[in-house]
């Protein structure tokens, strides 16, 4: 029996604001517990929330970038539940009138393009964080309480884990390029919940939904969905019923584990937030935000391919992160050849990042240094071999490439008036190589080049040496 999967994703993005959504407390990652809180975050009696307008600006940027319709009037609602990290016993969110609806993202999987709908996106506050100590005590950190979140809820349009992975990749890229969030999953500024059901092929009615919450990497999303597909198929084929439930992904086993069975959707008794007035969004403000939107990844890709002439694959690699793309643009602006800059960034720079498990913001190589080095390669000042030594020094120590080359005497020898006599002497001293060359043995010229390189301690420009040798040998 064949089955069809239906997948929907809920993605939370931490919006990049200086203060929280309803209080003036600062927002930063890694601060000491409960040092970025105040009476509003603690839900002290009599305090009232004060809306941070910048949250709307950032949310609207994401809405516009995903072709979503921004609602002219939105309001906040109370989602009622009790948990230690939620001191008010309710969360302020948007349930009845969200920020935006009816958007979409285009993905490409296995060579086919597909449009994935965005059901809605809404603004809400984050909860605090519980930590359970080995001493039997539990601790609550309210630093995260009230941090602004944008939740993007997809339509259930994805039909396999690869489509879900492609959707997440594209959504993350779009949000990152708007600057609304730094989308760092390892810091919790991007979190993913998945919903998956399966049904026999040809059946219209959807199967029973299984939810998986707080998946902390794209790989976990893909692997957990793949496992859950197979698990649900086995349940149905054995005559059982899939339970409406929440499960978690066990990274060690690659399996999903039951957390709780649901009897139905939770009743959070939503009602309008009485302490925050409905928020009216003027079209003129939406237009102003749209005008200020930074260049999208799709626009950059077009520029890289059409204006800079680099390959589509190279453009896609550069655009995997905004930091990488910004670094590339800065290098080209500093005078680097676009194609050479793409090659060095995608091979040498990315190789260093992967090997050392760091981001491009952590390295000491600047875009200007990369541009300077590429210019020296292109004008023949240094060889590609020497360039790798210069690159290593610059990326590890931040050394200026030009100064390093001059201080170490690495300037490539390209002066024909110096190399010409050396070539003539090497040819005179190696008559057998001349004979071999005339007999069509290509290795002969390689030997002669090697002799020149040995005499110049590797500083001779190989291209110039080859040209001079060919000319000299042809004249014999």
Swiss-Prot record:
GO terms for biological process: glutaminyl-tRNAGln biosynthesis via transamidation; translation. It catalyses: L-glutamyl-tRNA(Gln) + L-glutamine + ATP + H2O = L-glutaminyl-tRNA(Gln) + L-glutamate + ADP + phosphate + H(+); L-aspartyl-tRNA(Asn) + L-glutamine + ATP + H2O = L-asparaginyl-tRNA(Asn) + L-glutamate + ADP + phosphate + 2 H(+). It comes from the Bacteria. InterPro entries: Asn/Gln-tRNA_amidoTrfase_suB/E, Asn/Gln-tRNA_Trfase_suB/E_cat, Asn/Gln_amidotransferase, Asn/Gln_tRNA_amidoTrase-B-like, GatB, GatB_C_1, GatB_Yqey_C_2, Gln-tRNA_amidoTrfase_suB_CS. Disulfide bonds: none annotated. Pfam families: GatB_N, GatB_Yqey. Allows the formation of correctly charged Asn-tRNA(Asn) or Gln-tRNA(Gln) through the transamidation of misacylated Asp-tRNA(Asn) or Glu-tRNA(Gln) in organisms which lack either or both of asparaginyl-tRNA or glutaminyl-tRNA synthetases. The reaction takes place in the presence of glutamine and ATP through an activated phospho-Asp-tRNA(Asn) or phospho-Glu-tRNA(Gln). This is Aspartyl/glutamyl-tRNA(Asn/Gln) amidotransferase subunit B. It comes from Lactobacillus johnsonii (strain CNCM I-12250 / La1 / NCC 533). The gene is gatB.
